């Protein structure tokens, strides 16, 4: 009974507690005088302040629209690719190399002893690696997982090439649309170079910018002409202008060129050279011999004739000009791609980058140096050379800081504030530290044209980095 009574008493006590009014929570104010009005006012102000702050935060910021390029191009290319990923060039398969069966006969109709010897070596090499069943080795590159892995490992390198190529496409589109008769060579070159610098947006010229001086070679001058200070040459209506400029990103140089005409007078020459360049690109690939590419280029080039003012001209490959491989900070990496038939059995290799360029001429098809020099480059691998002329030492320091082994021209030195440097520059050339590259010309009165693309031999494919909608 006692336990039952205690339970009833506990329930009654609980009911009494529940009937009491709810306790007022203690003030959290710092005031100890119990001034509730002040607290209410302060709380009201705080609430109002919070509302105001919330209103400010809730204001929607205007979304920035997509970046728009200016004319001339001045907006850095990175603003158009905020992910940092740049578009691929044109992707092609490597040429399908089918080895000859063992015992393949040597061509008995080779034109010279050198060519016969080269053919014999080629036959021996093919016989060594060949089999009774033709096998397309390069086709396997696109399905070999190891090659795909190697390709992915180089993604960052590919992206730097592609950034330079994108800058090149934007700048050359503007140049092609705006080069007009009456412009000076200086204004054309600077229009291109200013845009390259703006789109690269690099304070350090060794991290990105101009890959080499802009070539603006006219008519019978095929290459290596850019204006020096005071140049007054003006583009005329019937001129044939070769525009050759480069863009580099961390030493990876995109080298691409086109030929500009104001009318159709020499269009047949341009068509021949463009077709020859496309042949070179098509034939290029891993394990392809450079001499074979040259032979194919020459065959395409010299299948064309041009009729101008009632006279027919045979288009010729300029036999002492070549394409070349490109190494980091080195426009000519050591391998040459001939544009005529050659006994050169050197092969293209995986991972190499090449500038496939062809030059056609209505003249001799052979160039010599002539005229005032403007192009220079520090020789690769040159060691310490004792220089006695202080000005030469100072000039070399400027070259090292701003160009390294990238080509430069006298206008670039002028732009850096160098003065009275010609004797010092001559001293560097004579000392073997710097190489000069004078203009290259065919016979006067003829016309020359050029087209060029940069290609990269990836493990799985061939990428035409500089390909665009224009060429």
UniProtKB/Swiss-Prot annotation:
It is an enzyme of class 3 (hydrolase). Substrate binds at residues 224, 332. Its cofactor is Co(2+); Zn(2+); Mn(2+); Fe(2+). Residues 16-80, 92-139 are annotated as: Disordered. Residues 52-65 have a biased composition (Basic residues). GO terms for biological process: protein maturation; proteolysis. Keywords: Aminopeptidase, Cytoplasm, Hydrolase, Metal-binding, Protease. Its EC number is 3.4.11.18. GO terms for molecular function: aminopeptidase activity; initiator methionyl aminopeptidase activity; metal ion binding; metalloaminopeptidase activity; metalloexopeptidase activity. GO terms for cellular component: cytoplasm. The keyword Metal-binding applies. The keyword Metal-binding applies. Residues 119-139 have a biased composition (Basic and acidic residues). A divalent metal cation 1 binds at residues 244, 255, 452. A divalent metal cation 2 binds at residues 255, 324, 357, 452. It is found in: Cytoplasm. It comes from the Eukaryota. It catalyses: Release of N-terminal amino acids, preferentially methionine, from peptides and arylamides. Residues 32-47 have a biased composition (Acidic residues). InterPro entries: Creatinase/aminopeptidase-like, Met_Aminopeptidase_Type2, Pept_M24, Pept_M24_MAP, Pept_M24A_MAP2, Pept_M24A_MAP2_BS, WH-like_DNA-bd_sf, WH_DNA-bd_sf. Binds 2 divalent metal cations per subunit. Has a high-affinity and a low affinity metal-binding site. The true nature of the physiological cofactor is under debate. The enzyme is active with cobalt, zinc, manganese or divalent iron ions. Most likely, methionine aminopeptidases function as mononuclear Fe(2+)-metalloproteases under physiological conditions, and the catalytically relevant metal-binding site has been assigned to the histidine-containing high-affinity site. Belongs to the peptidase M24A family. Methionine aminopeptidase eukaryotic type 2 subfamily. NCBIfam families: met_pdase_II. Cotranslationally removes the N-terminal methionine from nascent proteins. The N-terminal methionine is often cleaved when the second residue in the primary sequence is small and uncharged (Met-Ala-, Cys, Gly, Pro, Ser, Thr, or Val). This is Methionine aminopeptidase 2. It comes from Yarrowia lipolytica (strain CLIB 122 / E 150). The lineage of its organism: Eukaryota, Fungi, Dikarya, Ascomycota, Saccharomycotina.
């Amino acid at each position: 009974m006692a336990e039952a009574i205690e339970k009833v008493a506990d329930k009654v006590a609980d009911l009494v507690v529940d009937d009491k009014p709810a306790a007022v929570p203690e003030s959290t104010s710092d005031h100890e005088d119990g001034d509730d009005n002040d607290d209410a006012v302060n709380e009201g102000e705080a609430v109002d302040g919070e509302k105001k702050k919330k209103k400010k935060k809730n204001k929607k910021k205007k979304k920035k629209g997509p970046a728009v390029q200016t004319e001339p191009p001045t907006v850095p290319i990175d603003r158009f690719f905020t992910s940092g990923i740049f578009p691929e060039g044109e992707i092609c398969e490597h040429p399908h190399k089918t080895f000859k069966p063992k015992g393949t006969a040597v061509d008995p109709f080779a034109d010279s002893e050198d060519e016969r010897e080269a053919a014999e070596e080629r036959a021996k090499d093919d016989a060594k690696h060949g089999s009774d069943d033709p096998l397309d080795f390069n086709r396997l590159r696109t399905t070999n997982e190891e090659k795909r892995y190697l390709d992915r490992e180089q993604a960052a390198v590919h992206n730097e090439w592609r950034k330079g190529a994108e800058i090149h496409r934007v700048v050359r589109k503007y140049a092609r649309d705006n080069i007009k008769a009456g412009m000076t060579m200086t204004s054309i070159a600077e229009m291109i170079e200013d845009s390259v610098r703006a789109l690269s947006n690099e304070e350090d010229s060794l991290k990105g910018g101009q890959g080499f001086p802009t070539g603006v070679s006219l008519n019978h001058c095929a290459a290596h002409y850019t204006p020096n200070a005071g140049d007054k040459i003006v583009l005329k209506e019937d001129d044939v202008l070769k525009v050759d400029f480069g863009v580099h990103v961390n030493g990876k140089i995109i080298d691409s060129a086109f030929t500009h005409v104001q009318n159709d007078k020499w269009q047949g020459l341009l068509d021949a050279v463009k077709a020859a360049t496309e042949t070179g690109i098509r034939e290029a690939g891993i394990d392809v011999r450079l001499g074979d590419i040259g032979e194919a280029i020459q065959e395409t080039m010299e299948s064309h004739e041009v009729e101008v003012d009632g006279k027919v001209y045979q288009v010729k490959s300029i036999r002492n000009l070549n394409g070349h491989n490109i190494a980091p900070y080195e426009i000519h990496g050591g391998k040459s791609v001939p544009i005529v038939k050659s006994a050169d059995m050197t092969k293209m290799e995986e991972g190499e980058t090449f500038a496939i360029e062809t030059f056609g001429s209505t003249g001799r098809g052979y160039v010599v140096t002539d005229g005032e020099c403007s192009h220079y480059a520090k020789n690769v691998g040159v060691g310490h050379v004792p220089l006695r002329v202080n000005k030469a030492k100072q000039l070399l320091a400027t070259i090292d800081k701003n160009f390294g082994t990238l080509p430069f021209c006298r206008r670039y030195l002028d732009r850096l504030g160098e003065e009275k440097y010609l004797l010092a520059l001559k001293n560097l050339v004579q000392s073997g530290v710097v190489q000069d590259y004078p203009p290259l010309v065919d016979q006067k009165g003829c016309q020359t044209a050029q087209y060029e693309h940069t290609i990269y031999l990836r493990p799985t494919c061939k990428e035409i980095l500089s390909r665009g909608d224009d060429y």
